[in-house]
Structures are given as structure tokens and as C-alpha cells.
């Protein structure tokens, strides 16, 4: 027992004192707090913590100092002064400027205000006295300064401003053109003579002589000589007689002579000559000779001479002439339309005379028989007329002539253009020859 150290004794005493301070009724378990039983707190799920409301009006407590209950913290913000302020030598940042407490987290944060960034100014350190001294001037000094100023002299009215003038654009400076004289060396003329000049002469001239000129001489010239000249001699020369001089014959008189007279001569006269005159000669004259002997001379012989023989001879000649007109173009120009008209007129007169004699002799007995026979003859004559050319063929010929004339005009224009081109190339050849001679010198 004597060997117990002071450290153990001091620690025991210290623990006893702490136990007394923690529990006012003393320690029941001894000096060590580790053997003390802690009471368990019962947590009820039904009980809910109620929010504590702060009193609206707090009564003054004499024990506490004069404190104000603050529900929400309102930071003090300093607005930036717009006037010129005195700057500090050292930078200073206020603790309250731009401070905001977040209601959710409870932390304070600072707003980013561009006006407050930089040097901060303490409002209580502004030197207003210095500003007053600078701006304030006493009255005496002010009057002294005004007296020392020289008086203003009247210089008259202000000068009249210049009148605006029209805009004159600046003139463009003409850049002088430097003229260079090119001196050809000994090799250049030689190259020009052999390469450039020969290439121009050989290529251009050959193309003209071989290509263009041959085509003109062989193709165009031959076609002009064969086609155009031939058409002039054969067609155009013929058309002058037919269309130029003979237009009156073809269109004016000739239309009646060729178309109307032909139809009369071919259709009416043929039918009369072949049918009526033939029937008179063969049938009627024979019947008259057999039945009535007295009428043989009037109807038989008379009609044979007037209608039969005359019409037969005339009709054969007319048929040959018409065939020559439509078939042979060469003999068509040699025929005279007047002879053709006279023959047609004679045939018509002979037919009329024969018809008059027949009407007087026969009377009403042979009219029915003649009508039936005439119908058959007309059908035959219509078949003949269909085989012969009509007016449509003539119109086609005229259209073809017009087309040929247009083609001639086009070819003539081509000739003129070709001649102009040939003249141009001939001038070019002359120029090249002159240049070659000059270079040779």
C-alpha cells in the first residue's frame, strides 16, 4: 500500500469530481462512470415533432441584453456610386457586399456584380473637404480674375460660309503607252517564210483550192451548169412561152381553149363524132336507106359528108394533137393554140349541122333509141376522160416550177457568198506574197 504512486491517487480523485459534477445526486455505482447504467429513451412513432413558433411580440427580459429577434438575415449591400470617388491605396473587399444566403442550403454566396468588381471604396473615408476646396472660390478672387481679363473686341459679323459647288470628278491621268520597235533577227524571217507563211499558203490555199474550190467547181458549178442552165433552157425558157407570153393563152384564153375546149372536143365532140355521127352514118343512114329511100341524100349522104366524114377526119387529127400535147413536152411548144381552136370550132359546127338535119328527118321516132345509146357512149367517154390528165396535174406542174425557181434563187445567193469568200482569200494570198517578197529583200 505504501508503494502506490501519486499519479493513481490524482486520477481517482479527478474521476470522482467529474462524476459529481455530471450527476447532482452523487454516484451510486462508484467512482468509475463506465459501470453507470444509462437510461433508454423510448421513441414513439405516433408522436410527431411540432414546429416551434417564435413569438410575434417578444417581451423585454431584464436579464438579457437589448437583443432583437431576427427571423431572416438581410445582408447589407452597397450600391456603386456614380460620381467620381476617392480611390484607396490598397484593395478592400467588403464582407457584406453581394452576399446572399441561400434559403435551401443555408450557405452564403456572392453575386457576380460587374459594377462592384475592382476597387472598393469606403464611404466613411471620402474627403469631401478636398472637393469643396477645389470647387469653391471666394468672391474677392472671382472679381479680381474678372477684372484682369481683357475686354472682347467686336470683329464684325461672322464670315459667310462658302457656297456648295457642283462635284467635279477628278480627271483620269492618261498613262503613256510605250511603243516598242521589234527587230527581227536573222532566224525569224526564215522561220516565218518557211513555217508560218508556208503553213498559211499551203493550208489555207490548199483547203480553198482542193476542198472549197473543188466543191464549187465540181459540185456547185456542175449543178449550176447542168441543173440551173438546163432548167433555164428547158424549163424556164419554156415557161416564158408558157407562163410569160403564154399566160394569156393558158390562163385567160388558154384555160378556155385547153380545159373547156378540150373537154368539149374530147368529151362532147368525141361522143358526137363517134356516137352521133357514127350512128347516123352506120345506123340511121342505113335505116333511112332501107326504110325511106327519099331521105338517103338528106340524112344519109348529107350527114355522112357533114357529120360523118368531116368529124371523122377532124376527130382523128384532134386526138393526135391532144396526145402530143399531154405525152410529148417537146412538140407541145410547137403546136399553135389557134389551129387547135379552129378545129374544135369546125367540129362543133359540123356536129350542130348534123344534129339539126337529124332532128328534122327523124322527128320523134328515134329519140328514145338515141337517148339509150347516148348514155352508153357517155359512160365510155367518161372512162377515156379519167385516163387523161386533168387540171390537178397542171397545178402540180406550176407548183414544181415555183419550187425550182426558189431553189435557183438560193443557189444564186450561195454563189455570191462563195465569190465574196474567194475574193477575201485572194486578197489574203496577195498580202502574204508581198510580205514574203519584203522579207526576202
From Swiss-Prot:
Acidic residues compositional bias, start-end: 248-273, 312-332
Bilayer topology: Peripheral membrane protein
InterPro entries to which the protein is assigned, alphabetical: PCEMA1 (IPR010882)
Composition bias, Basic and acidic residues: 349-371
Biased composition (Polar residues): 294-306
Signal sequence segment: 1-15
The UniProt record lists the keyword Repeat: yes
Annotated glycan sites: 21, 112
Sequence repeats: 186-193, 194-201, 202-209, 210-217, 218-225, 226-233, 234-241, 242-249, 250-257, 258-265, 266-273, 274-281, 282-289, 290-297, 298-305, 306-313, 353-360, 361-368
Localization annotation: Cell membrane
Record's GO cellular component terms: plasma membrane
Disulphide connectivity of cysteines: none
UniProt KW keywords: Cell membrane, Glycoprotein, Membrane, Phosphoprotein, Repeat, Signal
Stretches for region Disordered: 232-416
Segments of this protein annotated with the region 2 X 9 AA tandem repeats: 353-370
Feature: compositional bias, Low complexity: 238-247
Renumbered residue ranges of the record's region 16 X 8 AA tandem repeats: 186-313
Additional information: Associated with the host red cell membrane throughout the entire erythrocytic cycle.
Role this protein plays: During infection, this phosphoprotein probably modulates the structure of the red cell membrane to the advantage of the parasite, although its precise function is not known.
Protein name: Acidic phosphoprotein
Naturally occurring in which organism (per UniProt): Plasmodium chabaudi
Gene expressing this chain: PCEMA1
